[in-house]
């Protein structure tokens, strides 16, 4: 999977609608676009809010996390972001969306699983979540998939903590 970005300059704040004109996957050419343009001051407030959130997330990466806490957050993240492709039971929809239940990568290759969520999979439907999810959410959803559907019994049982995701982003993993 992949994400295309484009920039434009808008004179007046408001909501603008359009149509995706680049065919980057099945039905993407039919994707409607909605853009909310805001004033400079609103944009600066938005950016400051993102900076504050990033600082808060950095503090959360230093926290000592419990497995149950990560699992609960991960389940929420999974149900919002992953379930459409990988299904509630982790069975996926092979061959397009692989099963996570019983997956050798999910059960035993934590580093590869982190890489997949951070980078996506070239030539497959799996996109990168590095910009869509926080370090806490990525660590939690990986921990969830490593512990759900019996994966904890057959795998190495390792959890992922937010600090590992931050380190990956900083090329330290």
Each language-model region and where it sits:
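Extracytoplasmic/periplasmic beta-strand context in beta-sandwich domains
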Residues: 31-33, 98, 124, 163
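Sequence/structural segment immediately N-terminal to covalent heme-attachment motifs in c-type
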Residues: 67-93, 101-119
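Flexible coil segments in periplasmic/lumen-exposed cytochrome c-class electron-transfer proteins
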Residues: 50-69, 80, 131-173
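The canonical Cys-X-X-Cys-His
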Residues: 20-21, 74-88, 126, 141, ...
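A short secondary-structure junction motif
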Residues: 50-54, 81, 88-92, 120, ...
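Extracytoplasmic electron-transfer domains, predominantly the class I c-type cytochrome c fold
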Residues: 99-155
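Short helix/strand-bridging catalytic loops that position acidic/His residues to coordinate divalent metals
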Residues: 3-7, 97-103
């Amino acid at each position: 999977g992949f994400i295309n970005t484009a920039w434009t300059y808008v004179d007046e704040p408001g909501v603008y609608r359009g149509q995706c004109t680049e065919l980057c996957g099945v039905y993407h050419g039919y994707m409607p676009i909605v853009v909310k343009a805001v004033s400079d001051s609103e944009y600066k407030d938005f950016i400051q809010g993102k900076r504050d959130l990033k600082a808060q997330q950095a503090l959360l990466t230093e926290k000592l996390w419990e497995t149950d806490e990560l699992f609960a957050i991960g389940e929420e993240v999974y149900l919002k972001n992953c379930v459409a492709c990988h299904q509630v039971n982790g069975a996926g929809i092979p061959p397009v969306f692989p099963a996570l239940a019983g997956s050798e990568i999910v059960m035993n290759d934590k580093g590869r699983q982190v890489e997949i969520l951070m980078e996506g999979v070239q030539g497959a439907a799996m996109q990168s979540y590095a910009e869509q999810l926080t370090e806490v959410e990525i660590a939690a959803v990986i921990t969830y998939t490593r512990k759900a559907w019996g994966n904890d019994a057959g795998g190495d049982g390792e959890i992922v903590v937010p600090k590992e995701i931050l380190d990956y982003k900083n090329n330290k993993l």
